[in-house]
């Protein structure tokens, strides 16, 4: 665990009208909760997109012909940095607003809680967490539960198993 103050720069952009979407302050709070005790300095971008852009990105980067709720793009360290130099750029999150809204309604979750969950989930991917097998998924889901509980948000996986 990392102790001490955290320097966090979260840039948020919206590719559709902001009405009903979380504020940049909310996204920053959720990212900060996911990073708390794990990293001391981070720059990342969050882009909220429509279904067309979400589908295009998911097709281009994952070969899937549908929009997904969140995509994580970890930053790559540039070549030639001196040994030991760390770059604070963590990466980018792309969140597809129509998919998030549809899932929240289908799952009976508040829209804000679902955005918080997916922001935490995507941020953990930027930190290297994954869910390719059951053991990884269980560990990542437990960490998500703990982070969301600190934010006062109910277990997003309750009732799934």
Swiss-Prot record:
GO terms for biological process: rRNA processing. It comes from the Bacteria. Its main location: cytoplasm. Zn(2+) binds at residues 121, 125, 131. Keywords: Cytoplasm, Endonuclease, Hydrolase, Metal-binding, Nuclease, Ribosome biogenesis, rRNA processing, Zinc. Its EC number is 3.1.-.-. It is an enzyme of class 3 (hydrolase). Single strand-specific metallo-endoribonuclease involved in late-stage 70S ribosome quality control and in maturation of the 3' terminus of the 16S rRNA. Belongs to the endoribonuclease YbeY family. This is Endoribonuclease YbeY. It comes from Xanthomonas campestris pv. campestris (strain ATCC 33913 / DSM 3586 / NCPPB 528 / LMG 568 / P 25).
């Amino acid at each position: 665990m990392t102790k001490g103050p955290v320097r966090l720069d979260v840039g948020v952009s919206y590719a559709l009208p902001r009405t009903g979407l979380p504020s940049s302050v909310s996204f920053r709070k959720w990212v900060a909760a996911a990073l708390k005790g794990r990293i001391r300095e981070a720059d990342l971008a969050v882009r909220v997109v429509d279904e067309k852009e979400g589908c295009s990105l998911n097709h281009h980067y994952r070969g899937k012909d549908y929009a997904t709720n969140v995509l994580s793009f970890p930053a790559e360290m540039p070549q030639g940095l001196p040994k030991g130099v760390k770059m604070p750029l963590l990466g980018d999150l792309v969140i597809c607003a129509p998919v998030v809204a549809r899932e929240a309604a289908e799952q009976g979750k508040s829209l804000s809680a679902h955005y918080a969950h997916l922001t935490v989930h995507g941020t953990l991917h930027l930190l290297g967490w994954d869910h390719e097998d059951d053991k990884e998924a269980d560990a990542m889901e437990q960490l998500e539960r703990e982070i969301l509980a600190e934010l006062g948000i109910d277990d997003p996986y309750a009732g799934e198993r």
